[in-house]
Amino acid sequence: MRILGWNCRGICNASTVQALGAQIKGARPEVVFLSKTKAKLNRMESVKKTLKFDDSCVVEAKGHAGGLCLMWKFGVDIKVVEYNKNLIAVKVSDQCVEWLLVGFYGPPYHSKKKKAWGDLFALLESHQGLWAIMGDFNYIVNEEEQLGGNRGGSLATNYLKELLFELNAVDLGYSGNKYTWVGGKWGKASIKRRLDRGVAIIS
């Protein structure tokens, strides 16, 4: 099964839908997870039809912030388990194996991290079996995942590191561009980080 995850930072522009369509054409995923759609249900229904997906679970944006969507093709056996403003969780039956797939958006603001990550941990700990998470975690695991800016360690809790360590999960790695986010000014003053990834428990 091929799965595509993307922090689209708003899906209301035709150019963004075209860019997503190009990615889908190249990767040919059966499942797509979008975060920060900044869109309501009717807009996501239109996007789903444009991209030729058959079913979806949508968490609407609040005003012009947030918004999640998981879309899948006909023939993919998916049952929605749970959803909130930070995650969509589904059970996937794939070749006689049932596993949990979670599309996750980790809030960048410290005041909102504890609740979002607490919900994620509770969901994973209640599931008996295999699981995988994809999305924008808004954390780096080590200094090699950042280029530029202050690379000093933070005393704040890194929930992604806790997830990898406490639940014996693994980072699924990447191909292509190492960094998925660029902030600050362009050029030497810019900061690049790997915030988007896939994480799974494989045994």
Question: Can you say where each PLM-predicted feature lies in the sequence?
Answer:
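A shared catalytic/ligand-binding motif for oxyanion handling
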Residues: M1-S203
